[in-house]
């Protein structure tokens, strides 16, 4: 079996100043291709440390993906460290120098002299193209390992891994591509309760289950390795969905927002949103996807009572009698948001995200959510105690999305979640 490792570079990564999302993405992507990373090492911007890691890990791994350190500044040392680790000099790659000059010309910019550093590669390096940036990728054989150098910019890394790295390792190591994966997205259920339902199932040979918690979602990954297992994957997936019931909210989607976007895009249906405690989160998550303007008409953050009255038309008496966090108020918010542009649907949220502001009657984590349609309004008030402010908001957004999703599927809009309580109306 091929031994794959990863070396992440950069003082800001090592010190925790930035979260290494590149490493998480790479590991997840490799797993989806049936390839497991054996080890990951993080190294700061010190030449001697980089040299030592390259020399030591190349004795054990077959392939090492090195991320970062290919920029034009003095702390970008990956190419120099690789050359010294192999006892080579850096030489100018004329093809990449031309690429740099062309790139700056196309962007109507004068190329700084410092960028020429990005064309300097170890003598034995094989250039790896990067059509979306200025950092030149390359690979070098040291001891038993191929070291594959990639840019730290996430977009550039992802492009290089998909277009260059994966085809390289498949060809170099003759890896079997007979691997398939299904992902089930769940909300409102703990990982242990999901596992309690799935683990008793007898899975066919070649099929395994994995879990990934990324609140407010928990993702269930169903891996199939080999032709027989791949053929059985749809049946196994269907069985697991049946066992989990309403916990499953999407298939092969990273978030519920992505699922809603997929359902509304090109549907001809429209959506408006009025948010209080979620503070624009619902709207923002949808706007992340290209094409959302085809269905998303407006997103309003009506945080104060005055804005609820003046913008959404909430009756002041409703606020006086029931408070901002209540079923009557959130229903009027949803109706008002829908009426502004005659949308097909409108979502509204109003709650107490904390850490302060709760009462005995309405403690922190109390959130009212409503969905207005052309035929009526659905609403519920959920309980999210002992959660952080961020988690209260993200779970509330997820429940709102799920109400809309279920309405689009003509299913019961309000359902029970194992880990989310609900007030009776």
UniProtKB/Swiss-Prot annotation:
It comes from the Bacteria. The lineage of its organism: Bacteria, Pseudomonadati, Pseudomonadota, Gammaproteobacteria, Alteromonadales. CDD domains: cinA (cd00885). SMART domains: MoCF_biosynth (SM00852). It comes from Shewanella sp. (strain MR-4). Belongs to the CinA family. This is CinA-like protein. HAMAP family: CinA_B.
């Amino acid at each position: 079996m091929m031994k794959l490792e990863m070396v992440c570079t950069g003082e800001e990564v090592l010190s925790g100043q930035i979260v290494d999302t590149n490493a998480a993405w790479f590991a997840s992507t490799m797993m989806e291709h049936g390839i497991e990373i054996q080890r990951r090492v993080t190294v700061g911007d010190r030449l001697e440390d980089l040299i030592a890691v390259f020399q030591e890990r190349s004795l054990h791994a077959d392939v090492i993906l090195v991320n970062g350190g290919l920029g034009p500044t003095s702390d970008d040392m990956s190419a120099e460290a690789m050359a010294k680790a192999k006892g080579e000099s850096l030489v100018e790659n004329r093809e990449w120098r031309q690429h740099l000059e062309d790139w700056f010309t196309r962007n109507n910019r004068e190329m700084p002299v410092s960028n020429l550093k990005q064309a300097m590669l170890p003598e034995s390096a094989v250039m790896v193209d990067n059509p979306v940036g200025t950092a030149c990728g390359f690979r070098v054989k040291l001891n038993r390992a191929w070291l594959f150098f990639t840019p730290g910019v996430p977009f550039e890394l992802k492009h290089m891994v998909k277009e260059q790295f994966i085809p390289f390792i498949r060809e170099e190591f003759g890896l079997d591509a007979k691997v398939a994966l299904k992902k089930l997205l769940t909300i409102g259920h703990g990982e242990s309760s999901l596992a309690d339902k799935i683990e008793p199932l007898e899975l066919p040979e070649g099929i395994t289950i994995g879990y990934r918690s990324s609140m407010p979602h928990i993702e269930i990954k169903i891996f199939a390795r080999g032709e027989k297992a791949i053929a059985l994957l749809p049946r196994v997936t269907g069985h697991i969905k049946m066992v989990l019931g309403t916990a499953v909210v999407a298939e092969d989607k990273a978030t519920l927002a992505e699922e809603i976007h997929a359902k509304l895009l090109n549907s001809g249906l429209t959506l408006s949103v009025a948010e209080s405690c979620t503070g624009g989160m619902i709207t923002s998550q949808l706007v992340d996807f290209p094409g959302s303007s085809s269905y998303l008409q407006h997103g309003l953050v009506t945080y104060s009572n005055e804005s609820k009255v003046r913008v959404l038309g909430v009756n002041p008496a409703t606020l006086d009698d029931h408070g901002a966090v209540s079923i009557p108020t959130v229903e009027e918010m949803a109706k008002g948001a829908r009426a502004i542009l005659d949308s097909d649907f409108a979502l509204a949220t109003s709650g107490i995200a904390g850490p302060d502001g709760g009462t005995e009657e309405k403690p922190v984590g109390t959130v009212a959510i409503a969905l207005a349609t052309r035929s009526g309004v659905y609403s519920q008030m959920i309980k999210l105690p002992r959660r952080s402010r961020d988690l209260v908001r993200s779970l509330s957004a997820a429940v709102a999305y799920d109400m809309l999703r279920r309405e689009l599927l003509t299913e019961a809009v309000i359902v029970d979640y194992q880990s989310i309580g609900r007030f009776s109306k």
